């Protein structure tokens, strides 16, 4: 499984990258706004800064909701850096845009996916990644992990190349469940990634080892 960090915060991206296990970054307009990054030029400079930190894919989302606007924005974003993946919402114009980008050799991440049907259309259009939103489905008493599992099974059965990028991950437990469901990628907050390191037996075992060492070595 690949790990992406879901943030536009450069310090968090650097910290995750220093762990040595980071494969990429996902961003969205809300995350960019949270960091106070406004205006097209500032956003694009920020994407380039992210690409300088991380060697893997960086998802940059279009703002337009019409086909012509998506194509224009997507081509401009893709031209910024080879690692940019154009993030497109799973709406009718988005599927058409993904098909266009596929023909042009531009990689895409189909986002805001909440059903198997949406994931099917994204794969048929040639999306590089599809992003089912685990946490948001859980918020409405649906089963986000089960959706990930069903999409993985469908892609395996029909031999689609689209990678399942589990998104809206809220916890370390979500990551483990996505691993068990067979997701190709999990995009997570830094806290969830670091949470994978934590286990009480690791802490107690280390404390015992250090105490025993001090007994012998003073």
UniProtKB/Swiss-Prot annotation:
Annotated pathway: Carbohydrate degradation; pentose phosphate pathway; D-glyceraldehyde 3-phosphate and beta-D-fructose 6-phosphate from D-ribose 5-phosphate and D-xylulose 5-phosphate (non-oxidative stage): step 2/3
SUPFAM superfamilies with a match to the protein in the record: Aldolase
Active site (UniProt): 87
Reactions performed catalytically: D-sedoheptulose 7-phosphate + D-glyceraldehyde 3-phosphate = D-erythrose 4-phosphate + beta-D-fructose 6-phosphate
Entries under InterPro entries matching the protein: Aldolase_TIM, TAL/FSA, Transaldolase_3B, Transaldolase_3B/F6P_aldolase, Transaldolase_AS, TSA/FSA_arc/bac
GO molecular function, one term: aldehyde-lyase activity
Protein name, as recorded: Probable transaldolase
Entry's EC annotation: 2.2.1.2
An example Gene Ontology CC term for this record: cytoplasm
Function: Transaldolase is important for the balance of metabolites in the pentose-phosphate pathway.
Main subcellular localisation: cytoplasm
Compartments reported by the entry: Cytoplasm
Family the UniProt entry places it in: Belongs to the transaldolase family. Type 3B subfamily.
PANTHER family: FRUCTOSE-6-PHOSPHATE ALDOLASE 1-RELATED (PTHR10683:SF40), TRANSALDOLASE (PTHR10683)
GO BP terms in the entry: carbohydrate metabolic process; pentose-phosphate shunt
Keywords linked to the UniProt accession: Cytoplasm, Pentose shunt, Schiff base, Transferase
Upper taxonomic lineage: Bacteria, Pseudomonadati, Bacteroidota, Bacteroidia, Bacteroidales
Disulfide bonds: none
């Amino acid at each position: 499984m690949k790990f992406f960090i879901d943030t536009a915060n450069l310090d968090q991206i650097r910290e995750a990258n220093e762990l040595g296990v980071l494969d990429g970054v996902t961003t969205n307009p809300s995350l960019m706004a949270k960091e106070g990054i406004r205006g097209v030029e500032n956003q694009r400079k920020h994407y380039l800064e992210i690409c300088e930190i991380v060697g893997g894919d960086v998802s940059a989302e279009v703002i337009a909701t019409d086909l012509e606007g998506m194509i224009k924005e997507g081509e401009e974003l893709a031209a910024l850096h080879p690692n940019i993946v154009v993030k497109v919402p799973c709406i009718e114009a988005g599927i058409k845009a993904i098909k266009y980008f596929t023909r042009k050799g531009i990689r895409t991440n189909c986002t805001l996916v909440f059903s198997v049907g949406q994931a099917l259309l994204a794969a048929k259009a040639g999306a590089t990644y599809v992003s089912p939103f685990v946490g948001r489905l859980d918020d409405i008493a649906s089963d986000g992990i089960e959706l990930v599992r069903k999409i993985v099974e469908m892609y395996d059965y029909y031999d689609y190349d689209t990678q399942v990028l589990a998104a809206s991950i809220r916890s370390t437990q979500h990551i483990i469940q996505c691993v068990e469901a067979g997701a190709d990628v999990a995009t997570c907050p830094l806290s969830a990634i670091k949470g994978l390191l934590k286990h009480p037996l690791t802490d107690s075992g280390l404390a015992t080892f250090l105490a025993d060492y001090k007994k012998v070595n003073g």
